[in-house]
């Protein structure tokens, strides 16, 4: 503990020194520019940093292929032109127009997102690209019969930035103002990335289905990403229009979008430091190629091709630079790791044995399926299934491949709505609820094929599961309000406690490792810990011992029993290893073709003629 506090204090000092150095550089940089041309490039670089970070929220954090982003940039610019120029003879102050245009642009982002985010991949890209092209056509053609946009001639003679009646016309002052807002966006991006919102977006990017199964409201989060990116783009558009004192349709065309995407991809999708570096490099480097005309634009493509060949993850990648976790355990941790070959006699066990309650099976139904049927076209995957899982019971489902076991999990967890029948949890009808609502009710699951968030750390994988239990929004996160700080402390406490149940396999230096760096067995353990971190009452484990060797299978078997006996979980298990089923089960249900063949204790079900026939086939006469 003391060592961790010392490390944290050291990191804070490093960050303070780094921030001071960056502040000094930004303060003196305008005076180091050789002429006004390079001062303008320096100022525009700050603007591109804002734009790249705004796109990084949508494409980098949330993984959405948004091709309408440049239109939001334009909406912000033209909003300033409408409200602070002679065009409509309206001259609102900059400090009023800036938040107003950002909010208006965010509204457009929300509207576009609410109508298009049910689409994915290429279809989303096509719709958002169409929006950007329609916006460009409106800019070009809304100059008659009433001149709204100025057409191809744009709108000029915009008001310069003014504060309380004092106009800012100095190029150096403009550079300070734009870089001031760029720094705010950088700092805000860091805070968002490390928060519940950042973890939710990253989970969606990694695996949208798994994210929702861990309690993330994916629709709302994608809308928030769209709106947040549009807000930043709108603010950048306002700053651009006030700096240039004019706006034209070709300021917001498709090549501009390509440049911004290049900045994000060059730096590394999702990596804030990398995106800032990408924006700086691609703002300055092409200026050295300006004399070559058409070849200047080709440089962007060439840079991307070389980067994709040599470093597909971008300059900084996604996690490595920002992750302060150790790559290898130190001597002390190595000792713990070697001493913890028995999964259940970890330091946690030795420290707090007295607080562990013992539970017995209850008679109260926790989960109940009533005549549930699921059809996929002409195929009936589940056929009139009824079952009850009692409080603190382990109920195992067995059956050959294709029997409908995982489909039952998908029905209970809300991935599929049943064709017929009802699902009840603790007496409440949860039929038709979305996965994140099912998680909030108290049901969590693992998957037959591992669905971890591979590029997220072990600790962040578990933290995602607390999403539905927390409420902090962007304002609370950006200003680190007490509610947000309290939720983060509670999230860390809960997730570290659940990971700690697996001892050194998922704790210590492993907290900061990517999930993909774990062994297969530890990935299985992490998926169980992640499900437990949702504060679930019912765990649905889909083949938890799959891929494990005999020793690992024994360990996970004992751990599942411990979840029931020591921690009071109710558990529904799908398992093909019958020795595991026999060891852990209070009751067993056998399925075949979606129908219940037998139900009872292990021996009754294993010796049932129909179950034997389902596994081995019908005996010939």
Question: Language-model segments: which ranges?
Answer:
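Helix-to-loop junction immediately C-terminal to a conserved catalytic motif
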Residues: 413
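The feature captures the beta-strand-to-loop junction immediately N-terminal to the Walker
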Residues: 398-400
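Catalytic Walker B motif of ABC-type/P-loop ATPase nucleotide-binding domains
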Residues: 539-543
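ABC-family P-loop ATPase nucleotide-binding domain
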Residues: 2-3, 320-373, 619-621
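A short, surface-exposed alpha-helical micro-motif characterized by mixed small hydrophobic
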Residues: 581-583
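Conserved ABC transporter NBD signature motif
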Residues: 421-428, 441, 494, 499-500, ...
């Amino acid at each position: 503990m003391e060592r961790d506090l010392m490390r944290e204090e050291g990191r804070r000092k490093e960050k303070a020194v780094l921030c001071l150095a960056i502040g000094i550089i930004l303060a003196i940089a305008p005076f180091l520019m050789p002429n006004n041309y390079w001062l303008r490039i320096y100022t525009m670089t700050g603007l591109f940093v804002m734009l790249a970070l705004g796109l990084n929220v949508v494409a980098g954090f949330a993984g959405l292929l948004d091709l309408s982003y440049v239109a939001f940039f334009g909406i912000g610019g033209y909003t300033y032109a409408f409200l602070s120029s002679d065009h409509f003879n309206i001259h609102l102050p900059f400090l009023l127009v800036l938040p107003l245009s950002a909010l208006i642009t965010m509204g457009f982002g929300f509207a576009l997102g609410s109508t298009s985010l049910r689409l994915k991949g290429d279809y989303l890209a096509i719709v958002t690209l169409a929006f950007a092209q329609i916006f460009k056509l409106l800019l070009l053609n809304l100059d008659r019969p009433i001149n709204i946009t100025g057409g191809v001639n744009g709108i000029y003679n915009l008001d310069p930035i003014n504060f309380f009646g004092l106009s800012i016309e100095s190029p150096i002052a403009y550079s300070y103002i734009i870089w001031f807002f760029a720094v705010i966006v950088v700092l805000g991006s860091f805070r968002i990335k490390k928060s519940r919102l950042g973890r939710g977006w990253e989970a969606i990017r990694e695996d949208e289905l798994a994210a929702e199964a861990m309690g993330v409201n994916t629709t709302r989060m994608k809308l928030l990403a769209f709106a947040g990116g549009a807000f930043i783009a709108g603010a950048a558009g306002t700053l651009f229009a006030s700096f240039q004192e004019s706006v034209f349709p070709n300021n917001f065309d498709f090549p501009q979008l390509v440049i911004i995407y290049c900045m994000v991809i060059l730096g590394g999708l999702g990596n804030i430091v990398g995106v800032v570096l990408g924006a700086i490099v691609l703002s300055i480097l092409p200026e050295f190629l300006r004399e070559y005309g058409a070849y200047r634009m080709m440089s962007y493509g060439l840079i991307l091709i070389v980067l994709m060949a040599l470093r597909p993850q971008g300059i900084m990648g996604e996690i490595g630079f920002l992750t302060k976790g150790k790559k290898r355990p130190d001597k002390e941790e190595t000792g713990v790791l070697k001493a913890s070959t028995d999964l259940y006699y970890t330091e946690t066990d030795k420290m707090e044995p007295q607080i562990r309650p013992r539970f017995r099976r209850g008679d109260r139904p926790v989960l109940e399926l009533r005549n549930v049927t699921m059809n996929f076209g002409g195929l009936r995957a589940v056929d009139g299934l009824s079952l009850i899982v009692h409080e603190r019971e382990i109920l195992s489902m067995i059956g050959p491949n294709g029997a409908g076991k995982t489909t039952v999990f998908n029905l209970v967890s809300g991935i599929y709505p049943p064709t017929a029948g009802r699902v009840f949890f603790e007496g409440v009808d949860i039929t038709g609820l979305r996965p994140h609502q099912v998680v909030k009710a108290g049901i969590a699951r693992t998957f037959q094929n591992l669905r971890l968030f591979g590029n997220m750390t072990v600790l962040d994988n578990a933290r995602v599961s607390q999403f539905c239990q927390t409420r902090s929004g962007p304002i609370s996160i950006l200003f680190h309000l007490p509610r947000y700080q309290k939720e983060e402390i509670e999230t860390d406490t809960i997730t570290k406690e659940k990971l700690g149940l697996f001892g050194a396999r998922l704790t210590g230096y492993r907290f900061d490792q990517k999930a993909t760096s774990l062994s297969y067995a530890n990935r299985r353990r992490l998926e169980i810990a992640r499900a437990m971190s949702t504060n679930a009452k019912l765990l649905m484990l889909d083949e938890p011992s799959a891929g494990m060797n005999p020793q690992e299978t024994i360990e996970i078997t004992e751990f599942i029993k411990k979840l029931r006996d020591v921690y009071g979980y109710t558990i529904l298990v799908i398992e093909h290893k019958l020795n595991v089923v026999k060891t852990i089960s209070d009751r067993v249900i056998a399925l075949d073709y979606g129908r219940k063949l037998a139900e009872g204790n292990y021996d009754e079900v294993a010796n049932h003629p129909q179950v034997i026939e389902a596994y081995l086939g019908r005996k010939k006469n």
